[in-house]
């Protein structure tokens, strides 16, 4: 019975050792892959840094201010365009009214002239 127990314990220990070796190998592979990926990502990050230089905060702030200035100028131009479009519409309306008044005046004169000729 003791021999069976000892054999069983030895078998269990061998299983544990095999399992531990398997886990150690798997962990080592995972750590190696992770390390390689990390290294690749660091290299890629450095390439990106060189390729796309990040502007400092002062320069970014200057760009934002310039953008806002241009937006304000654009808004001012749009309001001027709106004003001139309305003015043009009013002038066209005024011109139409003047044409109507001129025709009415012409009709009055022609009637007046025809009345004075009689």
From Swiss-Prot:
Which keywords belong to this entry?
Answer: Coiled coil, Endosome, Transport
Q: What is this protein called?
A: Biogenesis of lysosome-related organelles complex 1 subunit BLI1
Short name of one Pfam family: BLI1
The gene name reads BLI1
Family, per entry: Belongs to the BLI1 family.
Q: Where in the cell is it found?
A: Endosome
This protein's GO cellular component annotations are: endosome
The subunit structure is: Component of the biogenesis of lysosome-related organelles complex-1 (BLOC-1).
Does the entry feature the keyword Transport, yes or no? yes
- Segments forming a coiled coil: 55-104
Q: What does this protein do?
A: Component of the biogenesis of lysosome-related organelles complex-1 (BLOC-1) involved in endosomal cargo sorting.
